């Protein structure tokens, strides 16, 4: 089979050849939440038995692991931080309810 060559004519201004520069950005496929904001909130306002502070420490470790590229480690630290945040929130709300009930009974 003979190869056909086609010519394309562009109307308008003359064509100036320039070299094109390509930039590639490697983006991570999965974004792992590190729960830093939630941990900071729990540290400042709902720090039941220092659970908020420990959750903040695990959140920072998760963020560090994510920056290094260790997604498995980041997910493990983020999961621990999430559990600690939920525990801190639950126990702080439970303590507040108990205090309100005890004060209301007196």
Curated annotation (Swiss-Prot):
Main location: membrane
Lipidation (S-palmitoyl cysteine): 49-50, 83
Stretches assigned to the Extracellular side: 106
Lipid bilayer topology: Single-pass membrane protein
Keywords: Antiviral defense, Cell membrane, Immunity, Innate immunity, Lipoprotein, Lysosome, Membrane, Osteogenesis, Palmitate, Transmembrane, Transmembrane helix
Family affiliation: Belongs to the CD225/Dispanin family.
Assembly mode: Interacts with CD81. Part of a complex composed of CD19, CR2/CD21, CD81 and IFITM1/CD225 in the membrane of mature B-cells. Interacts with CAV1; this interaction enhances the ability of CAV1 in inhibiting ERK activation.
Record's protein name: Interferon-induced transmembrane protein 1
Origin species: Mus musculus
């Amino acid at each position: 089979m003979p190869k056909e060559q086609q010519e394309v004519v562009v109307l308008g201004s003359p064509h100036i050849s320039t070299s094109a520069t390509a930039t590639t950005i490697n983006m991570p496929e999965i974004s792992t939440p590190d729960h830093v904001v939630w941990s900071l909130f729990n540290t400042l306002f709902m720090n039941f038995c220092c659970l908020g502070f420990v959750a903040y420490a695990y959140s920072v470790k998760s963020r560090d692991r994510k920056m290094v590229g260790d997604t498995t480690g980041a997910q493990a630290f983020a999961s621990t931080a999430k559990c600690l945040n939920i525990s801190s929130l639950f126990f702080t709300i439970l303590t507040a309810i108990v205090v309100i009930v005890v004060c209301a009974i007196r």
